[in-house]
Amino acid sequence: MFIFNSIADDIFPLISCVGAIHCNILAIRTGNDFAAIKLQVIKLIYLMIWHSLVIISPVVTLAFFPASLKQGSLHFLLIIYFVLLLTPWLEFSKSGTHLPSNTKIIPAWWVSMDAYLNHASICCHQFSCLSAVKLQLSNEELIRDTRWDIQSYTTDFSF
């Protein structure tokens, strides 16, 4: 037996997806001096489906994962978690790279943990994105030595 939702339950998520897509397009246009971005109808539908899947996948994971978690599988999940957590740091220490020397305002460990935690929170579903070696943190040109305190506090607040 199927349970049909009301019209409001079907329309509000659709409006939310369309609004989020238009906000993203506006942000891209604003960042690129209001360059013209034209979407065909099929691309807009594709973006709506993609955005809906982006919204639904964490909800489904959070709902079904604890329900299927058995105590016998807990040690396997912890091993996988710690491997994913420690592998980028092991690669970083094995490569011999170092943090830039122009991070004097705040401690280097704070910068490294802040970058790692923020990057992990954004890209936690993509293991290849977490590698600190691929970020080339030893390149001093990537990091300006000005405004470190403001950027650090802003990043910490957003995390």
Swiss-Prot record:
Its main location: membrane. The chain crosses the membrane at residues 1-21, 45-65, 72-92. It is a multi-pass membrane protein. GO terms for biological process: single fertilization. It is found in: Membrane. Disulfide bonds: none annotated. It comes from the Eukaryota. One of its GO terms (cellular component) is membrane. InterPro entries: XK-related_adapter. Keywords: Membrane, Transmembrane, Transmembrane helix. PANTHER family: MEMBRANE TRANSPORT PROTEIN XK FAMILY MEMBER (PTHR14297), XK-RELATED PROTEIN 3 (PTHR14297:SF9). Belongs to the XK family. This is Testis-specific XK-related protein, Y-linked. The lineage of its organism: Eukaryota, Metazoa, Chordata, Craniata, Vertebrata. The gene is XKRY.
